Amino acid sequence: GALVAAYGLYDGFLTL
């Protein structure tokens, strides 16, 4: 999710 992206976690999203 875009929310967890702020935490720098991976949620089926390309989040570093």
From Swiss-Prot:
It is a multi-pass membrane protein. Its main location: membrane. It is found in: Cell inner membrane. GO terms for biological process: amino acid transport. Keywords: Amino-acid transport, Antiport, Cell inner membrane, Cell membrane, Membrane, Transmembrane, Transport. It comes from the Bacteria. It catalyses: L-ornithine(in) + L-arginine(out) = L-ornithine(out) + L-arginine(in). One of its GO terms (cellular component) is plasma membrane. One of its GO terms (molecular function) is antiporter activity. The keyword NADP does not apply. Belongs to the amino acid-polyamine-organocation (APC) superfamily. Basic amino acid/polyamine antiporter (APA) (TC 2.A.3.2) family. Catalyzes electroneutral exchange between arginine and ornithine to allow high-efficiency energy conversion in the arginine deiminase pathway. This is Arginine/ornithine antiporter.
